[in-house]
Amino acid sequence: MIWRIRNRAVFGRFRRDGRRARVGPLWMSVIVDPAAVPPRMAFSIGRTVGSAPVRNRIRRRLRAVARARADQLAPGWYLVGADAEYARTPFALAEEQFLQAAEKVGALVTPTLEAR
């Protein structure tokens, strides 16, 4: 499960304290916080990306990828965005790019032997 970010102060913290990564058309800023269980996530898709249907398609894709991989994400606050190219990316590649970005910022949880 993923929760939304509703607190405005958190967005200021992304600029100050967030770790950032970019993989292809996807970018991610993360503040790892053990108290943020389940992970909190917001999506930022600017108007320059395209029309509202394109932006919504990207947002839905990001949300689906985040839900599918929520168990691999460290507790924390996530701000995720993407370029227009992300809307045309196959789902498997979109998942891979999401996980690569999370790995770059140190937000992936490695499964323990007991969990396998």
Roles of regions detected by a PLM:
Residues 1-116:
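Positively charged, solvent-exposed patches that mediate nucleic-acid binding
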